Design a protein with these regions (language model features):
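N-terminal helix-loop segment corresponding to the beta1-alpha1 unit
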Residues: 1-201, 375, 381-409
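Oxidoreductase and adenylate-handling cofactor-binding alpha/beta cores
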Residues: 185-205, 218-230, 271-278
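Conserved Rossmann-fold dehydrogenase catalytic segment
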Residues: 141, 169-177, 200-216, 235-242, ...
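Aromatic-enriched alpha-helical interface/lid elements that frame and gate functional surfaces
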Residues: 245-321, 325
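A glycine-rich dinucleotide-binding beta-alpha-beta segment and adjacent secondary-structure elements
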Residues: 320-370
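Short linear loop/turn motifs
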Residues: 281-291, 329-336, 393-409
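Glycine-rich beta-alpha junction loops
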Residues: 51, 138-140, 212-217, 254, ...
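Short Gly/Pro-enriched turn/cap motifs at secondary-structure boundaries
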Residues: 237-242, 247-248, 350-353, 372-375
Length: 409
């Protein structure tokens, strides 16, 4: 099925058209946040240091221009400028960019902007009272861990996330995707949108303090809440759910199947579907609490039945009967799946760019991939000109190494 047959094909200027975001972030959490904003029409000016966002080099794989899939995946729809913020002239240029900006987002070590004379409370809030300043850090500026840098895998470990991921045999395991970084990016985007909505009422901007640590701890449901209620430390259960069963991976003839049975009706329909109606009336499995307490016995009985079926038709049949079930797909399986294509979650833009799609579909103002990730410094001259800097001044800034159109190696 081609993307053109999807009901989401039309693209608009976007719900955030007219908003300007000055993006000083690099790596993942911040760039993911600003890509979400850019997908929905915000003008995002990606201000890169002279060496560029280091993720441009995080590969392989690389495209034919030598840029990594990692960088390409979270930087579409943006305009890139190179700017040396360690220089006074660079800071002055940043000040010009902020004059008509709605949002400033950065992920420097806490205190960096203050050291540069650009702290929110003392400078930015006074000079740009409508500016929303979002700071993304590992742990925040204060508290026992305040000021330390944060990294996704380290925060997964420190937050307790790894302690409940994996199996008794494997021990703690890092989640395969950078959930903390990306969850933090989502939280930053949500916070920015809330602040812009509130600004429409008050006329004032505000400072947003978003951390990887907070984002990771907030994801500890239900294990964190189970502990707060029971006082019992959660343990690693592998793929199984700590509160619900059968909620686990089961082998079939050809591929693993995941079941997520959450109530008695679903369990009865599952039992009927695998020609084992006796399971639904077995007193050991009469409700979720019993099924969860007797999960070992139930898993063995279900595994014996499920092994007789091929995964894909079984999963589809269960879904049609209202039983939550799905094959354990590989990444290639997902990228080629007709539903992925139908939902436009695999998209292309200019220059052969291909990436994951836009997850929020809006009916009147849909977003999308308007342009691929920018070449370093490709908008430097244009953005500085739009900020009121003359052509002669721009060339002087470039010649002095303050503004850049090519990466400094």
């Amino acid at each position: 099925m081609s993307p053109d047959s999807s009901p989401f094909s039309t693209m608009s200027a976007g719900a955030l058209a007219g908003y300007k975001v000055v993006d000083l972030t690099r790596v993942l959490g911040g760039p993911y946040c600003t890509m979400i904003l850019a997908d929905h029409g915000a003008e995002v000016i990606k201000v890169e240091p002279p060496q560029g966002d280091e993720t441009r080099d995080w590969g392989p794989p690389f495209n034919d221009k030598g840029e990594s899939a990692y960088y390409q995946g979270v930087n579409r729809n943006k305009r890139s400028i190179g700017l040396d913020l360690s220089s006074e002239a660079g800071k002055a240029v940043l000040g010009k960019l902020l004059e008509d900006a709605d949002v400033l987002i950065e992920n420097f070590k806490p205190g960096t902007l203050e050291k540069w004379g650009l702290g929110y409370k003392d400078v930015l809030a006074e000079r740009y009272p409508r500016l929303v300043h979002c700071r993304v850090t590992g742990f925040g500026a204060d508290g026992p861990l305040g000021g330390f840098p944060g990294y996704d895998a380290v925060i997964q470990a420190m937050s307790g996330m790894m302690s409940v991921n994996g199996s008794p045999e494997s021990g703690p395991v890092r989640v395969g995707t950078p959930m903390v970084d990306m969850g933090t990016g989502l939280n930053a985007a949500i916070a920015i949108l809330m602040a812009l909505l509130e600004r429409g009422k008050s006329g004032k901007g505000q400072f947003l303090d978003i951390t990887l640590y907070d984002s990771a701890v907030a994801l500890l449901h239900p294990q964190g809440n189970n502990y707060l209620m029971s006082g019992k430390p959660p343990v690693i259960t592998g793929n199984a759910h700590p509160n619900v069963y059968p909620y686990d991976v089961f082998p079939t003839k050809d591929k693993d199947l995941f079941l997520a049975v959450g109530n008695n009706g679903q369990f009865k329909r599952l039992a009927d579907a695998v020609e084992a109606p006796e399971l639904a009336v077995d007193p050991r499995f009469k409700d979720n609490a019993d099924r969860s307490s007797n999960r070992g016995a139930l898993k063995a009985l279900l595994a014996e039945k499920l092994a007789q079926y091929e995964c894909e038709p079984l999963a589809l049949g269960l879904l049609q009967k209202g039983v939550p079930a799905g094959p354990v797909n590989t990444i290639p399986d997902v990228m080629e799946h007709p539903h992925t294509i139908f939902r436009q979650m695999r998209v292309g833009a200019e220059n052969g760019y291909g990436a994951l799609g836009v997850q929020a579909k809006l009916s009147r103002t849909p977003g999308g991939a308007r342009s691929g990730p920018p070449k370093f410094g490709s908008a430097t001259r244009a953005v500085l000109s739009e900020a009121g800097i003359s052509a002669d001044e721009i060339e002087t800034l470039i010649n002095d190494g303050v503004a850049l159109v090519d990466r400094r190696k």
